[in-house]
Amino acid sequence: MSVLDDIVAGVRLDLAERESATSLADLRAALADVDPPRDPMPHFRAAGSSVIAEVKRRSPSKGDLATIPDPAELARSYAAGGAAAISVLTEQRRFGGSLADLRAVRAAVDTPILRKDFIVSSYQVVEARAAGADLVLLIVAALDDDDLRRLHDEARELGLTALVEVHDEPETERAVALGAELVGVNARNLKTLAIHDDTFGRLAPLVPDDRVKVAESGIFGPDDVARFVREGARAVLVGEALVKDGDPEGAVRRMTGVES
């Protein structure tokens, strides 16, 4: 079993518990009380680099990264630094995240929020919107074509922007065929956790220029951002480097607006 398969198996177990506690119908009813979703795309299409700043306590590859006792405070720092969006990990077994973190961040900032998780069910898409998310992550490697299209369509129906994540050429072709407007290229292989520095440069040319390309993993400072911008990135998703920085606001500011 690959790392990705193991994570998804755990996600499905946790999902079953939440489904037994709150019905999909009740979740949908809760949408009436949620503010309309925010559109992140104008930020991503602006000149220079945009930053998706992540609230991330730990990862399968690095273990514990940061305690983050107050995700709302961290999110306010990111927003003050000019983050175009804030990514909140909600997977608990491997990443130490929760929907409570997402709700806390939503209450603290007006910045668009990405629910970063392993989305495999319609329930999770509705759950994301009910918690106040504006974007959801869809990992191509975790979904077959039918599920990928269904979840992408359901996200759009709810006004959510889907960040469609790819790791290799076949996945990139699937994302392009899907019509994904926001394509994330992750340098980390989720099946092995290895990082390949050439992944973005190899895959970005396969994505049409009218789509927004997001570089993910292996980004630690403005020099990394500049390299990805030269290769076609409009945005970068950064987690570890920001949660470990004593000045997350300044770190986001230094990575924002970088041009080739």
Curated annotation (Swiss-Prot):
GO terms under biological process: L-tryptophan biosynthetic process
Cited Gene3D superfamilies: Aldolase class I
InterPro entries: Aldolase_TIM, Indole-3-glycerol_P_synth, Indole-3-glycerol_P_synth_dom, Indole-3-GlycerolPSynthase_CS, RibuloseP-bd_barrel
Pathway annotation from the record: Amino-acid biosynthesis; L-tryptophan biosynthesis; L-tryptophan from chorismate: step 4/5
Gene Ontology MF terms: indole-3-glycerol-phosphate synthase activity; phosphoribosylanthranilate isomerase activity
Catalyses which reaction(s): 1-(2-carboxyphenylamino)-1-deoxy-D-ribulose 5-phosphate + H(+) = (1S,2R)-1-C-(indol-3-yl)glycerol 3-phosphate + CO2 + H2O
Highest taxon, organism lineage: Bacteria
Transmembrane segments: none
Keywords (A to Z) from UniProt: Amino-acid biosynthesis, Aromatic amino acid biosynthesis, Decarboxylase, Lyase, Tryptophan biosynthesis
EC numbers for this chain: 4.1.1.48
Protein family (similarity comment): Belongs to the TrpC family.
Name listed for the protein in its UniProt record: Indole-3-glycerol phosphate synthase
